């Protein structure tokens, strides 16, 4: 049992510290070489004493008694400050004589200056030196160092070790992540290489087809050149024949339709794969010339109209004139069955919420289809709109061509002065009259008749040679006829830049042609009429694109530029500004009505001012060089849009709502940004604030 009595501890302490006892101890006769030879670590021998509960309470009670000091309440003695003696003056203070101090006491205490172990460099630089020697460094730098410096060096060395370990771990982790990223990129690269290999194979097939087309074109050119030489010799020998009769052998070049054949072959293969993958598709869709697949989307589900719950997954196939909806079979996974099919002319599409489309088919059947992704929803909706617009343009163009051809042929027949202008036989004339009588109901017959008429006129002119040589006017007219035939391809594909370029080239050729023969004059008039019809068709398509395109700014800008190239800059500017006005109105409607009028006003201000600024920048690009001529139209439009904005603000402030300084600040900032494009409408805001000053906080 350990006794914690403080009395005994004090007695023991006095015994150990007594100088008399120390002198009586014998001094060691032999010095040890190692002072710590018999040293035993306290951690190995020291043990905590075991104290019982009773002794622990006893010690605690005794400690409390010693530490508890009870002093009486201290009361300071009274001091009379009035009777205190005065303080001595500075003259009476004794002067200290420093000369009595010893010189040794006056010397400052010089300490040992700290030693720079690292020599101005970091410890990492010293250890990373390839010529570093540890023993030499310790001997030179730490030989005379103090314990504090050695401890500081050891601490730095330990920190450096931990830092290096952390860097090693970080580098290992970084290397691992980079390796994983490289593996992912390698997987992507391998997939892309496989796709590239398949594309290269397809390209080789296409290049082989192009080679065959080129060889066939060369053969046709050689044959045409040989036939033209033969026709020249024939016209020299048979100049006494009638010029209106067709030649025995036509000298017109056969047109190479290889590219069209290849394209139709690709479309046929796509339809064949559709028939193989969708059961029952052949019942609804029949192979037809020009019929092709525009889009195949499998991100759709059919929705129950009553419960709005998904029924089954569907796949939608959009053709250029039809739409097919196929569903997955429940018994066989992966196989498709045709469910609905309808012509695009009989299909009605309505947009619903949550990426849902409502289809009204021609058989009065109504279905709801929901897309899993917004991109699939937007892609199908845009393709349906473009396909329906293209069909509408085709039908409208056929009807317009039929009407214009009927009127033009009626005018040409009424202005003929002699029966020699009829280049066809009576039987052909009778059939032509019957065709003209039904042009309005059958526009395809009108186009066929026009082509036959142009071919007959061009073929008959090969035999007309007054000087015995080839008629250059006939050659140019035939060239223009072929160019007009090829012009329909870029117009149908909406490639307006190429179409306008070819149209200008054809018009320049027609301006330089001077026809003297009657057949040449008639063909020239027909070509000019067809050229004007093509120009009108391109104008209608561009007008439709500019009026309906809101999302794609590049497409809108290119369409406006194409309409300017057609020689209608004023109309193009009006359509462009009208499109932007509708775009602003749609964005304002999307913002909706808010309970907070200030938030609504600030959002509308940002939308309108930023759109006006962008329109001004696009105007400078579109009308580069002629901005001064049409700038007044732009300024008038901008002024109207700003007036619309303030009118909208006035409507919002009809109630008890008030404008906050933050809303005014944002509106002023947006209007100030218009100064960068030359528009200053700050005075309108100031006038508005003066009129409605009672509506401001």
Curated annotation (Swiss-Prot):
Functional summary from the UniProt entry: Involved in the secretory pathway as part of the exocyst complex which tethers secretory vesicles to the sites of exocytosis. Plays a role in both the assembly of the exocyst and the polarization of this complex to specific sites of the plasma membrane for exocytosis. Also involved in assembly of the spliceosome.
One cellular-component annotation, GO: cellular bud neck
Similarity-based family: Belongs to the EXO84 family.
Pfam families cross-referenced by the UniProt entry: Exo84_C (PF16528), PH_EXO84 (PF25345), VPS51_Exo84_N (PF08700)
Subunit structure: Component of the exocyst complex.
A GO biological-process term: exocyst assembly
Glycyl lysine isopeptide (Lys-Gly) (interchain with G-Cter in ubiquitin) crosslink location in chain: 169
Places the protein is found: Cytoplasmic vesicle, Secretory vesicle
Record region (Disordered): 13-33, 231-250, 411-445
Presence of the UniProt keyword Transport in the record: yes
Protein's name in the database: Exocyst complex component EXO84
Entries under InterPro entries matching the protein: Cullin_repeat-like_dom_sf (IPR016159), Exo84 (IPR033961), Exo84_C (IPR032403), Exo84_C_1 (IPR042561), Exo84_C_2 (IPR042560), PH-like_dom_sf (IPR011993)
Source species of the chain: Eremothecium gossypii (strain ATCC 10895 / CBS 109.51 / FGSC 9923 / NRRL Y-1056) (Yeast)
Polar residues compositional bias, start-end: 13-32, 411-423, 434-445
Gene designation: EXO84
Predominant subcellular localization, coarse grouping: cytoplasm
Keywords from the UniProt entry: Coiled coil, Cytoplasmic vesicle, Exocytosis, Isopeptide bond, Protein transport, Transport, Ubl conjugation
Coiled coil stretches, renumbered: 149-212, 377-407
């Amino acid at each position: 049992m350990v006794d914690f009595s403080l009395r005994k501890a004090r007695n023991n302490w006095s015994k150990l510290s007594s100088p008399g006892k120390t002198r009586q101890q014998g001094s060691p006769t032999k010095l040890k070489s190692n002072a710590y030879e018999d040293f035993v670590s306290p951690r190995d021998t020291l043990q905590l004493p075991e104290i019982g509960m009773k002794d622990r309470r006893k010690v605690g009670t005794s400690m409390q008694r010693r530490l508890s000091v009870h002093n009486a309440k201290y009361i300071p003695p009274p001091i009379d400050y009035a009777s205190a003696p005065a303080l001595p003056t500075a003259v009476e203070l004794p002067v200290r004589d420093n000369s009595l101090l010893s010189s040794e006491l006056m010397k400052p205490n010089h300490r040992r200056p700290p030693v720079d172990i690292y020599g101005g460099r970091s410890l990492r630089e010293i250890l990373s030196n390839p010529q570093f020697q540890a023993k030499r460094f310790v001997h030179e730098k730490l030989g005379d160092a103090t314990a504090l410096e050695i401890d500081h060096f050891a601490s730095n060395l330990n920190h450096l070790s931990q830092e290096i370990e952390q860097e090693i771990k970080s580098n290992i982790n970084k290397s691992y992540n980079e390796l994983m990223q490289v593996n992912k990129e390698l997987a992507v690269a391998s997939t892309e290489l496989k796709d590239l290999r398949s594309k290269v194979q397809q390209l080789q097939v296409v290049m082989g087809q192009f080679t065959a087309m080129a060889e066939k074109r060369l053969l046709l050119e050689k044959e045409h050149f040989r036939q033209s030489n033969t026709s020249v010799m024939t016209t020299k020998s048979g100049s006494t024949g009638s010029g209106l009769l067709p030649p025995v052998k036509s000298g017109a070049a056969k047109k190479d339709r290889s590219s069209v054949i290849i394209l139709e072959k690709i479309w046929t293969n796509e339809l064949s794969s559709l028939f193989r993958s969708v059961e029952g598709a052949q019942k609804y869709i029949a192979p037809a010339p020009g019929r092709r697949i525009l889009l195949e989307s499998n991100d759709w589900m059919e929705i129950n109209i009553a419960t709005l719950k998904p029924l089954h997954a569907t796949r939608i196939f959009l053709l250029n004139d039809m739409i097919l909806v196929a569903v997955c079979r429940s018994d066989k996974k992966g196989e498709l069955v045709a469910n609905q099919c309808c012509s695009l002319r009989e299909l009605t599409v309505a947009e619903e919420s949550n990426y849902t489309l409502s289809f009204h088919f021609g058989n009065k059947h109504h279905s709801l289809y929901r897309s899993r992704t917004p991109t699939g929803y937007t892609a199908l909706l845009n393709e349906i709109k473009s396909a329906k617009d293209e069909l509408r343009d085709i039908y409208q163009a056929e009807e317009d061509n039929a009407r214009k051809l009927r009127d033009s042929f009626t005018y040409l027949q009424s202005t003929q002065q002699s029966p020699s202008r009829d280049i066809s036989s009576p039987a052909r004339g009778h059939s032509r009259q019957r065709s003209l009588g039904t042009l309005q109901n059958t526009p395809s017959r009108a186009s066929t008749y026009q082509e036959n008429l142009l071919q007959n006129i061009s073929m008959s002119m090969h035999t007309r040679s007054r000087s015995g040589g080839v008629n250059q006017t006939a050659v140019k007219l035939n060239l223009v006829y072929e160019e007009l035939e090829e012009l329909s391809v870029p117009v149908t594909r909406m490639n307006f830049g190429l179409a306008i370029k070819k149209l200008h080239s054809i018009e320049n050729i027609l301006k330089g042609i001077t026809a003297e023969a009657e057949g040449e004059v008639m063909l020239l008039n027909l070509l000019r009429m067809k050229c004007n019809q093509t120009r009108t068709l391109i104008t209608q398509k561009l007008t439709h694109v500019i009026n309906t395109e809101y999302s794609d700014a590049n497409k809108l800008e290119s369409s406006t530029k194409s309409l300017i190239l057609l020689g209608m800059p004023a109309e193009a500017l009006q359509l462009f500004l009208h499109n932007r006005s509708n775009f602003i109105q749609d964005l304002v409607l999307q913002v909706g009505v808010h309970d907070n009028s200030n938030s609504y006003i600030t959002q509308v201000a940002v939308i309108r001012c930023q759109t006006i600024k962008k329109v001004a920048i696009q105007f400078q690009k579109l009308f580069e060089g002629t901005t001064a001529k049409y700038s007044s139209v732009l300024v008038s439009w901008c002024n109207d849009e700003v007036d619309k904005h303030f009118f909208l603000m006035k409507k919002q402030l009809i109630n008890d709502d008030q404008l906050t300084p933050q809303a005014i600040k944002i509106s002023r900032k947006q209007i100030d940004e218009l100064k960068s494009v030359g528009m200053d409408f700050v005075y309108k805001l100031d006038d508005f604030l003066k009129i409605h000053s009672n509506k401001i906080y």
